[in-house]
Amino acid sequence: MITLFRIDFRLLHFQTAQVWPQKTGANEIVVANDSVAKDALRISLMKMSAPHGCKLKIIPVAEAITYLNSEASKERKIELLVETTHDALRIAEAVEGITALNAALMKGGEGKKMVSPSLAFAPEDFENFRKILAKGIRVESYVAPDDRPVPIEKYL
């Protein structure tokens, strides 16, 4: 069962490794990212950040989809972390039962529009969020558990 599905360009860091699992009761963190799954240094750093008593998987998106659709995942309380709306959409389209997505931190850069202090959208992000919303998934932006959620529609 997915307890938190979050877009965060930093993926695993203090808040996602320590604060969120306590808030959601997650006993497993799945980092779904194709490039990180091949990067031994980043994997090593993330493993050092993982909370005690919480299983950590760092796997490509396709493998995450397979796992999230398996019976084994149904027995876990999973915090699912992705870096981009593209990866979030891939998962939203392929995994049943997702009801919510937290758009927390999306990095700025050339060609991106800052829509809030923590969110910068590339043109494709607007469309990806619309597709996720069309699946009936609630998408809200908040960084910390006690922040007030802002519906993503405000920024589209």
Label each PLM-derived region with a short phrase.
Residues 58-104:
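Ordered, amphipathic secondary-structure segments that act as subunit-interaction surfaces
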Residues 1-55:
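Long, hydrophobic N-terminal alpha-helical segment
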Residues 7, 49, 53-57, 67-81, ...:
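Short basic, glycine-rich beta-strand/loop surfaces that mediate nucleic-acid
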Residues 13, 33-34, 69, 78-81, ...:
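C-terminal catalytic "cap/lid" subdomain
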Residues 1-2, 24-27, 54, 74-77, ...:
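Short coil/turn connectors at secondary-structure junctions
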Residues 5-7, 31, 57-60, 80, ...:
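General beta-strand structural signal in soluble alpha/beta enzymes
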Residues 94, 99-156:
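Glycine-rich, aromatic-bearing surface loops/beta-hairpins
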Residues 9, 33-36, 60-64, 85-86, ...:
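Short, ordered loop/turn segments at secondary-structure junctions
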